[in-house]
Structure formats: structure tokens, C-alpha cells
Amino acid sequence: TRVSVIEPEYCYPQPVDLAVVRKVLTISEGKFAVSDINGNIVFKIKGKIFSIHDRRLLTDAAGNPVCTLRHKIMIVRDRWQVFKGESTEEKDLIFIVKPSSMIQLKTKLHVFLATNPKENVCDFRVEGS
């Protein structure tokens, strides 16, 4: 079964390898691009590096807002909350991402949909290479 977490126009019928590349780094702002294996930019990530509210905006290649990522530092584990568009309101929460364990040699993340508030079992897993 297919599950569309973000808008369907950003879904591919087959698995796609994507890479996050730092495009420009200044003292106050970091910009990243997400590209496919051919180097085509699929998404852009914009956000302030040094700010009280650690937020990033994910846009498509044309600059249309897709979702907002908000970093929350917790006592036990860091987490990222992902919201629809440019919102950070709880009603627009799509999912939460957190590391599968505190110490990792290879990035492994657990994704919990907003409909899974207890976070006992993750809805998806993401592994880096």
C-alpha cells in the first residue's frame, strides 16, 4: 500500500536516491539542495542556522513551500517536527522524526505520523548510507 505523507505530486512510483548538498553557507543562514542522481535539484532547504527557533523551510525546485521542519531539543533525544507548508501549528503537524538510538555510526531515523501520538512503534524508518 502507498502512503502519501506529503502532497502526491512529490511522490515517485519507484524508489529514488536523493542527496542533500550544501549550496551556500553564510554566518546566519544555511541553504541546502536535495538533488537526484543526475544532479537535478528536486527540493531546496532554507533556514536560519543561529536562531531561537531552529526552523527550515523545504520548497520544491520552483520555490513553492512543501513543509516546515522545526528542531526540538529534548532531554533524552532530539527530534524534528514536520508541518504542512510554512505552518508550525500543531493542527498542521504531519510527522515527527527522531534518531532510532542516541549513538549511531550510520544514520537511522524513526518517523512517527501525527496520527501516532504515543510513538511506541514507528510508522517508517529512514536509513542513510
Language-model features: where?
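Intrinsically disordered, low-complexity proline/glycine-rich segments
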Residues: 1-129
